Amino acid sequence: MAFLVFQLQAPLAAWGDTAVGEYRGSHNWPGESALVGLLGAALGIRREDDAAHMALSRGYGFAVGVLSQGALLRDYHTAQVPGRAALKKRPHATRRDELAVPKDELHTILSTRDYRQNVGYLIAVQPLVDAPHDLP
């Protein structure tokens, strides 16, 4: 059976964890969603093409070997957000819409984000029966 095997290395990475409230953690390794996105980008698939990404997710199996989980880097952010009353008054589909309120209706919030420094992974991609693309 053929596999696509490659290394991922980065001086700084974040592998999204569940983000609730002001804390955005990071896993120690890339998850399936990140690997499907990376594979999709390499194939030229647009981020908005949900059907193509679902086909990648169903069509391949992924394995991650952690060569170096790196060190934790915790960063603190500030962001401006409108109050709830301001949002009730207007539609807000984008971040730009959220900030298009009078300045005195904006509030500052603090958030914490985790990153991993100097990470290294060995990734193996295995095509399954319904893989949409052949491996090189």
Regions found by a protein language model. Give the residues of each.
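Charged, low-complexity intrinsically disordered regulatory segments in eukaryotic signaling
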Residues: 1-7
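Glycine/small-residue-rich interface belts in oligomeric ring/scaffold proteins
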Residues: 2, 17-91
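Short polar catalytic/cofactor-binding loops
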Residues: 8-14
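Generic preference for well-ordered secondary structure
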Residues: 13, 19-23, 48, 99, ...
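Short, surface-exposed beta-edge/turn micro-motifs
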Residues: 1, 61, 118-122
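Internal, well-folded beta-alpha domain core
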Residues: 66-136
